[in-house]
Regions:
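Short, charged helix-capping/linker segments at alpha-helix termini
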Residues: 2, 14-23, 33-52, 156, ...
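Internal acidic/polar
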Residues: 2-6, 84, 91-117, 122, ...
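C-terminal edge and immediately downstream basic/flexible tail or linker adjoining helix-turn-helix-like DNA-binding
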Residues: 12, 98, 114, 122, ...
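Sigma70-family region 2
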Residues: 14-15, 38-41, 52-69, 87-90
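Amphipathic, Lys/Arg- and hydrophobic-enriched alpha-helical face
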Residues: 25-43, 60, 124, 169, ...
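Residues within the DNA-recognition helix of helix-turn-helix
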Residues: 28, 49, 162-165, 169
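Arg/Lys-rich amphipathic alpha helix in sigma70-family domain 2
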Residues: 59-66, 76-95, 113, 174-176
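Helix-turn-helix DNA-binding module
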Residues: 121-125, 129-133, 137, 141-158
């Protein structure tokens, strides 16, 4: 069953096949949590969002129609749940706490990397929702502009424009931080 297509698995899930659901979950849960973490800004919300998205897969499987690839549909569900959650609660980046330093690593270099990661995460968190989603889907999840466009329900040219604006905003924000502004 590991070679079964996502569409075949959804048909089996619609019939109540729990092993098919577990397989589909194994295929997508990890990347979905990664996507959700980058959008929501914390692990707990990301886990909850993915659990809710997987529940929707199970409950909506009988009504699911393969108008787009399952991955596109599933990421869209995850993204919508993330954006809804972000609208309810303010963004507090988990990266602000940082990871404990590796005692064997150069502490100064590790601290600088952690600070850079924190600043980038904060700058991404400050982007408008659609720009943030375009950046995360394209650069962190490795999706093509066409796949990102399908998830965001927009055109490829709109995704390209979102990416240009997002990168400009990130560059400006990070340059301002380097100059000591924020």
């Amino acid at each position: 069953m590991d070679e079964a297509s996502d569409e075949d698995l959804m048909a089996r899930i619609a019939a109540g096949d729990e092993p098919a659901f577990r397989l589909l979950t194994r295929r997508y849960a990890g990347r979905a949590v990664s996507l959700a973490r980058r959008i929501t800004g914390n692990d707990a919300d990301a886990e909850e969002v993915v659990q809710e998205a997987l529940l929707r897969v199970w409950t909506n499987a009988p009504r699911w129609r393969p108008l787009a690839a399952f991955r596109t549909w599933f990421y869209r569900v995850v993204l919508n749940l993330c954006l809804s959650r972000r609208r309810r609660a303010p963004f507090v980046p988990l990266a602000a706490a940082g990871d404990p330093p590796d005692p064997s690593a150069d502490v100064a270099a590790a601290a600088e990397r952690d600070e850079t990661d924190r600043r980038i995460a904060a700058a991404i968190g400050d982007l408008p929702d659609r720009q943030r989603a375009a950046i995360v889907l394209t650069y962190y999840e490795g999706l093509s502009n066409a796949e990102t466009a399908a998830i965001l329900e927009t055109s490829v040219s709109s995704v390209e424009a979102l990416l240009v604006r997002a990168k400009r905003s990130l560059r400006d924000k990070l340059d301002e931080q380097r100059r000591g502004g924020v």
